[in-house]
Amino acid sequence: MAHKKGQGSTQNNRDSIGRRLGVKKFGGEFVRAGNIIIRQRGTATHAGNNVGLGKDHTIFALVDGFVKFERLDKNRKKVSVYPAA
C-alpha cells in the first residue's frame, strides 16, 4: 500500500520567465552613448568600434552615432557605432 498519494501533475507547470535578450537597436538606427544595442548570453556578436562590452556580454554604444553590423571573419560578426559625419 502506498504511503503517499501519487504526485500526478503537481510538480509540472513551472517555467522561468523570458530574459528579454536580443537586438535592441538595429543596423542604421541612431543611438546615443550608453544605449544598449544587444543583450546576449556569451559573445554571439562581438564588440566593434565605439561600443563597449558589459560583464553580462551586453553591447552598448560609447558614442552617439549609427549602428552598423559587420562581419569579423567567416564565422563571427561584430557591431560598431559610427559617429554621424
From Swiss-Prot:
GO biological-process terms attached to the record: translation
GO MF term (any one): structural constituent of ribosome
Database matches in SUPFAM superfamilies: Ribosomal L27 protein-like
Pfam families the record matches: Ribosomal_L27
InterPro entries membership: Ribosomal_bL27, Ribosomal_bL27_CS
GO CC terms: cytosolic large ribosomal subunit
Secretion signal span: none
UniProt keyword terms in alphabetical order: Ribonucleoprotein, Ribosomal protein
Family that this chain belongs to: Belongs to the bacterial ribosomal protein bL27 family.
PANTHER family hit by this protein: LARGE RIBOSOMAL SUBUNIT PROTEIN BL27M, RIBOSOMAL PROTEIN L27
Protein's name according to its UniProt entry: Large ribosomal subunit protein bL27
Organism: Campylobacter concisus (strain 13826)
